[in-house]
Regions:
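Hydrophobic/aromatic-rich alpha-helical bundle segments in the mid-to-C-terminal region
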Residues: 3, 143-147, 162-213
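Hydrophobic alpha-helical connector segments
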Residues: 82, 96-127, 175-178
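Solvent-exposed, amphipathic alpha-helical segments
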Residues: 36, 40-48, 94-98, 132, ...
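Short, basic, alpha-helical segments at the C-terminal edge of helix-turn-helix-like DNA-binding modules
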Residues: 85-92
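N-terminal intrinsically disordered/low-complexity leader segments
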Residues: 1-32, 213
């Protein structure tokens, strides 16, 4: 069995519990909340790797004692689990809710989905995504979460095509192709010229929703 970062077999199951609601941004004179620790740990994950996420390093970074950390997490492992739960919620479940509300038709939702990676905050999210997946290549626990996230996303994309009138098997193939385009565009659009964004969106959407003659 592959090595786990948490060292607990039950950690993958704890990820299925509902995540706490994200706290609002704290004032400078207010105590740290759980989200502050998660954000700091994510910053280290992107800048270094998961091995760089150490309690003493986090405390130094945030200017607090270890007691503040242990107020929110029993162990470093609990923080790692919380990071993955937070990533799944913010970058998958919340995105699905946002896309669902963003358009009245499945085609409009697909277009908004394709446009996600060009939004201002997308580069930062792409860095987190890449770092999580790099971690998952070597460790079992995050790999299970990444696999679950991929299935959730693919299932949602597939349902968009089913709602647009495509058969289930065809919808699954189009969903996979859509996922490949979104993931690839999130990496490549900053270094390669794919043409005007609006033109790219319309041509890609037309290709993905085109029916055989």
């Amino acid at each position: 069995m592959a090595k786990t970062e948490t060292g607990k077999k039950g950690d993958a199951e704890t990820l299925k519990r509902p995540a706490k609601r994200s706290p609002t941004r704290r004032r400078k004179d207010s105590p740290l909340n759980e989200q502050d620790w998660i954000d700091a740990a994510m910053e280290i994950l992107v800048r270094e790797n998961v091995r760089g996420i150490r309690i003493d390093s986090l405390c130094s970074m945030l200017g607090v004692t270890k007691g503040s950390f242990y107020w929110h997490f029993k162990t470093r492992n609990d923080l790692l689990v919380a990071m993955l739960k937070n990533w799944r919620r913010r970058m998958t479940l919340n995105v699905i809710q946002s896309i669902t509300r963003s358009g009245r038709t499945s085609k409009a939702r697909l277009r908004n989905l394709l446009a996600l990676v060009r939004r201002p905050k997308s580069p930062a999210f792409a860095q987190i995504e890449s770092s999580i997946r790099d971690w998952a290549r070597r460790v079992e626990m995050p790999r299970e979460v990444v696999s679950e996230v991929d299935e959730i996303r693919l299932d949602y994309f597939q349902q968009l095509y089913i709602d647009a009138g495509f058969e289930k098997d065809d919808a699954r193939k189009r969903a996979y192709l859509t996922y490949c385009i979104v993931m690839g565009d999130s990496i490549l659009h900053r270094t390669l010229d794919g043409g005007p964004h609006e033109e790219f969106l319309e041509e890609t959407l037309d290709m993905l929703t085109r029916r055989g003659s």
